[in-house]
């Protein structure tokens, strides 16, 4: 099935509002296995909308119009669609009752004749009730093409799509199932290069890479009639990806840290800390509390996070973390020594299972002979202390700070997984 989205509204063309409905609808239709081929925006003009409908009816099986269902003169979507299909507009009984109820409870509101337009649908259409507004939607099939009209405000469109439109479209359609693999430690260009054969030869399932700040995701998608069928197909493809080696010989399996569109390294660490009953603290210099704030984002953070330190100056590192000032001056704040002592000091002072520390050069200027993006990350547990050095080149100050926290979370994640393997 080929689908097309038509956004109706001059305010979209003039840039007054962003057409977020297109993204939402495209994603929802993709989940149903319905392919969206065209996005169109047209102003509040009957002749231009008629022209767009004529074109759409010749190239698409499903045409969804968004916006223009309100009471004003420039809300002309239903009227124009009715004219295009050679049909009349009729009143939907349920939508009319909703109008009656709305104005009955608001005696100060004047019910002008144009308000009645919101309760109209194209003759022969199945109404799509508006759960959060007054303008009724509708769905109708004429000469093999299905037309849908939806309200423009996202607060009205989304509930109508989720609770009214999707059930109407799901009959006799396969569903698109997706699985998102999340990677840390490999760039998009290298990842695409090493799985090039899988991407070039893809049919079903498909692979779509997405680069995010500091990490990469792969969305694996397949059309199937059930979750079980989809899992079988996606499992095969995932195993092929996991068995691939990076250019320096690492297994991609070791670089996958989790699944899901909304997952994150921070959440994986939070989950593992709770799972193993461990606690963590942090001492931060260049990241200024960003690591700690990320942990605190999750409900129940107090179970795993005892508190932390933000120590920008050398003097505060010495005073708050118990590091001899002379040693800090000797080694410098941007060093393995300082990262390790910060991690150890924070862990001891809070009696936590893990201490993590970040110190380095956020930029744009160099510091102590180290280029911008040079970061040392220390990690301490009850038995040992160690640190890593990373260089995050060609990034803004905010990106350096954010990516530094990703490295820190990954370091903690690896430590927790090693502890699990030793049990």
Curated annotation (Swiss-Prot):
Belongs to the CinA family. CDD domains: cinA. InterPro entries: CinA, CinA-like_C, CinA_C, CinA_KH, Competence-induced_CinA, MoaB/Mog-like_dom_sf, MoaB/Mog_dom. This is Putative competence-damage inducible protein. It comes from the Bacteria.
